[in-house]
Curated annotation (Swiss-Prot):
GO molecular function, one term: copper ion binding
Cellular location(s): Cytoplasm; Nucleus
Gene: HIRD11
Tissue distribution of the protein: Highly expressed in the cambial zone of the stem vasculature (at protein level). Expressed in roots, rosettes leaves, stems, cauline leaves, flowers and siliques.
Protein function: Intrinsically disordered and metal-binding protein. Binds to the divalent cations cobalt, nickel, copper and zinc, but not to magnesium, calcium, manganese or cadmium. Binding to metal ions decreases disordered state, decreases susceptibility to trypsin and promotes self-association. Can reduce the formation of reactive oxygen species (ROS) in a copper-ascorbate in vitro system.
Organism of derivation: Arabidopsis thaliana (Mouse-ear cress)
Name of the featured protein: Dehydrin HIRD11
Subunit (UniProt): Interacts with PXL1.
Amino acid sequence: MAGLINKIGDALHIGGGNKEGEHKKEEEHKKHVDEHKSGEHKEGIVDKIKDKIHGGEGKSHDGEGKSHDGEKKKKKDKKEKKHHDDGHHSSSSDSDSD
């Protein structure tokens, strides 16, 4: 079990088992800093998901700024019509019982 965990740790480069030669050089660390410091703000994936869930910046889930109120109202009206139509029709079996 411990061997398996150590193999996973080595593959993901986590844990304290690194040798001196395997450490990143200081130049490699600084090389990536320039990529992150461009002029625009990079939004994290968590922030993007939160915006989609909560409808951030006034946008709806489809991303076009449309309101879903009309769709909800249509569904509600359709549901009400369906309930009003149920059970008040005469069927062929009703006419046979006379």
